[in-house]
Amino acid sequence: MKRFHVHVAVADLAQSTRFYSAMFGASPSVQKDDYAKWMLDDPRLNFAISSRGNAAGVNHLGMQAGDGAELAGLHARLLDADSTVTAEKGGSCCYARSDKYWVTDPSGIVWESFHTLESIPTFGGNAARSAMPENTAKAACCG
């Protein structure tokens, strides 16, 4: 089952972690020095914050696929949207290795469709960023 994803760049990670923990009524499922993530079931949401953005605010939005078949379906929808889609296979970002597709909507909002393959011990970096349109690369997860 798919899960909505939001990644927000924050100015103060500790203060933001306390705020969102209280708001969601849950502690982060992943917490690092520069990153925190809540995997919520109600609402079905993957909400992440990090101190790695250029400015505080929404970094990107996305859809997390439950498996490779769901990701293929999301990819097909992105292609149907007549947008430039950038593939990132086995990308390392946000303490996870994932297969991803990046797209920018007509208003310049960056969207990520992804399937997480495994957790990794480092924040990582986007190998595909150099192939992305400039506005997408600037806002992508590891910006």
Locate predicted features.
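Vicinal oxygen chelate
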Residues: L13-A14, G62-V110, E118-P121, G143
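Short, charged/polar surface micro-motifs in flexible loops or helix N-caps
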Residues: D41-L45, N54-A56, G66-L71
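Core segments of cupin and vicinal oxygen chelate
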Residues: M1-K2, H7-N46
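Short acidic/glycine-enriched loop/turn segments that link adjacent beta-strands
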Residues: K32-Y35, A55-G57, C94-D99
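A short linear hydrophobic-aromatic micro-motif
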Residues: S27, N46-A48, T84-K89
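Residue-level recognition of strand-loop junctions within catalytic nucleotide-signaling folds
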Residues: A11, S50-R52, G66
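N-terminal beta-strand motif that seeds the catalytic metal site of vicinal oxygen chelate
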Residues: M1-A14, R44, H60-L61, T122-G143
